[in-house]
């Protein structure tokens, strides 16, 4: 675990653009009933957010860590929007009108501004262009550079 340098949505695998083909996990034994309850709660939340059949990579941008922002940037964010020392990327995107935006067959969900969906035969170029458009809008309004959670291949 320590050798992989895991941190929020990051690791050596991601930094070095490694692709994992196989993994083995050693887990500690826990309270079975408590773990089942936690799994069910998590699945309920995920199924509300990511309906079965949606063609999407999950949340496109990482949430922004408060520790990485200046006082000037933080002044633009309502305190109630800071959750666990992070600012949800979905909040920032919603504030710049991302919900429901489209480019070709790529659409940002009307119910979640950080959920980019392929509605048919969307292209990687449309996906990239739409993400960059709203990354720029967030930067202009909040002075915050959103970081992609999705790994982009062939784009910079």
Where are these regions (language model features)?
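Phosphate/pyrophosphate- and phosphate-bearing ligand-binding catalytic cores of soluble enzymes
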Residues: 1-126, 141, 145-156
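Phosphate/pyrophosphate-binding loops and the adjoining catalytic core of nucleotide-dependent enzymes
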Residues: 134
